[in-house]
A protein has these predicted regions:
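Short aromatic-glycine motifs in intrinsically disordered, low-complexity regions
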Residues: 1-10, 72
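Catalytic strand-loop segment that frames the active site of acyl-thioester-processing enzymes
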Residues: 10-46
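Hydrophobic core residues within well-ordered beta-strands of beta-rich domains
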Residues: 13-15, 96, 110
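Conserved positions in beta-strands of structured domains
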Residues: 17-20, 87, 101-103
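Extracellular/lumenal ectodomain signal focusing on beta-strand-rich modules
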Residues: 18-21, 83, 130
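HotDog/MaoC-like acyl-thioester-processing domains
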Residues: 28, 60, 91-92, 101-142
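Compact, glycine-rich, soluble single-domain proteins
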Residues: 42-61, 78-79
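Hydrophobic beta-strand-centered segment that forms part of the acyl-chain substrate-binding groove
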Residues: 60-99, 132
Length: 142
């Protein structure tokens, strides 16, 4: 599924190509890293790009969940990023794959765990980052 309507970012700053909802608590997103990506330095896609990809993946998943359950997408914010482990960088031509799992929902706060891996081909996938995030959904703009 395309994510362009689920996140506030617009080209050229979209860092998620596709999303597959696996269950109400789990999704998988992908991003093909292209030369034109604003967060690429030459052919290098580093920590800031990977973290932005994770954040947009989480936002797309929460937006999709909100749309399915409430019929609309609410504005939201990242409330916390913790335990961010950056293990390796990626390069143009690689595909980032991120698994997002909701661990807790308490009112307007959703806690997620994210695991991101990179592959240059289907048989060569390795982890590049993981973290925990808390996202706040702002329903005050009803």
């Amino acid at each position: 599924m395309k994510t362009i309507g689920l996140i506030p970012q617009r080209p050229p700053f979209v860092m998620v190509d596709d999303m597959e909802v696996i269950s109400p608590e789990h999704c998988r997103t992908t991003l093909l890293i292209k030369d034109a990506n604003l967060l690429c330095d030459e052919t290098f896609f580093g920590e800031s790009g990977v973290l932005e990809h994770i954040a947009q993946s989480a936002a797309a998943f929460i937006g999709d969940k909100s749309l399915r359950e409430e019929g609309r997408i609410w504005p939201g914010y990242i409330g916390e990023i913790k335990n961010f482990n950056f293990l390796d960088s990626a390069k143009t031509g690689d595909v980032l794959t991120t698994e997002i799992r909701i661990t807790t929902i308490f009112g307007d706060v959703t806690a997620i765990e994210a695991q991101t891996s990179v592959s240059s081909d289907a048989d060569n996938q390795h982890p590049v980052a993981n973290c925990v995030m808390k996202l706040f959904v702002d329903r005050s703009h009803a």
